[in-house]
């Protein structure tokens, strides 16, 4: 296995996008570093996809490695940060595994995209395989313009548009598959608030969109696609 070099910065340090000194550690994976150093801020630059647990939360970081200049860091509890520049496609954040239909998700932070990006509650189910997004904010591209509209509903102080799209032979939690995406897109963008996820599950069901009965991970996520930006978020 190829040995990767990762950087670890102390919790009290300024995030690694500054010139603050860091300790360099050799490890074969992000998971190994989390196990060896659970109480530090983890920073990963241009890293391969990885999942695991950190400070009591599940995390996921996926990238297509298409020239990605992406820095992903994790702090205490549910805190995580991204900075990216001229990235390929990436998505990641912190949350839970498995997810569930009744979770109330609280989050706060800052989100500053330049180009195509989403801030969303994000996850997967199986049987059937479904990728879902509750988009709380986005950059230059509104996903509601590229999917089939199934109506709208009100939750947590805003109207959300319901959408569905199909991805053909694309990456998934089960490898390359064809699957549907369910979307709720908030009209009033925000970077802090509460998502009552059951409201979205019910609205999707009423629109004929049924999630699978096997829950995989469920996270607050930042996604970027050939864009730049920064985000620092905490999920609770």
From Swiss-Prot:
Glycans are attached at residues 39, 106. Keywords: Carbohydrate metabolism, Glycoprotein, Glycosidase, Hydrolase, Polysaccharide degradation, Secreted, Signal, Xylan degradation. It catalyses: Endohydrolysis of (1->4)-beta-D-xylosidic linkages in xylans. GO terms for cellular component: extracellular region. Residues 1-45 form the signal peptide. The active site is at residues 131, 223. Pathway: Glycan degradation; xylan degradation. GO terms for molecular function: endo-1,4-beta-xylanase activity. Endo-1,4-beta-xylanase involved in the hydrolysis of xylan, a major structural heterogeneous polysaccharide found in plant biomass representing the second most abundant polysaccharide in the biosphere, after cellulose. This is Endo-1,4-beta-xylanase 3. The lineage of its organism: Eukaryota, Fungi, Dikarya, Ascomycota, Pezizomycotina.
